[in-house]
Amino acid sequence: LETVIVDNIKCNNKNCIIICNKKNCIVFNCIFNYKIS
């Protein structure tokens, strides 16, 4: 299993979660989510 890093950040004054592994990062917020390669 790959290591998963979860970080809480601020996006537009709202809480966001970034979930990263060795291949990509996924950013979640209250309105939408998108993948960062």
Curated annotation (Swiss-Prot):
- Is Lipoprotein included in the keywords of this UniProt record? yes
Q: Which UniProt keywords apply?
A: Fusion of virus membrane with host endosomal membrane, Fusion of virus membrane with host membrane, Glycoprotein, Host cell membrane, Host membrane, Lipoprotein, Membrane, Palmitate, Phosphoprotein, Transmembrane, Transmembrane helix, Viral envelope protein, Viral penetration into host cytoplasm, Virion, Virus entry into host cell
An example Gene Ontology CC term for this record? host cell plasma membrane
Q: Is Transport given among the entry's keywords?
A: no
How this chain sits in the membrane, per its record, is: Single-pass membrane protein
Q: Where in the cell is it found?
A: Virion membrane; Host cell membrane
Q: How is it modified after translation?
A: Palmitoylated.
Q: Which GO terms describe its biological process?
A: fusion of virus membrane with host endosome membrane; symbiont entry into host cell
User: Which family does the UniProt entry place this protein in?
Assistant: Belongs to the baculoviridae gp64 family.
What's this protein's function?
Envelope phosphoglycoprotein which mediates the fusion of viral and host endosomal membranes leading to virus entry into the host cell.
Question: What is the protein name for this chain?
Answer: Major envelope glycoprotein
Q: Which organism is it from?
A: Bombyx mori nuclear polyhedrosis virus
Top-down, what is the taxonomic lineage of the species of origin? Viruses, Viruses incertae sedis, Naldaviricetes, Lefavirales, Baculoviridae
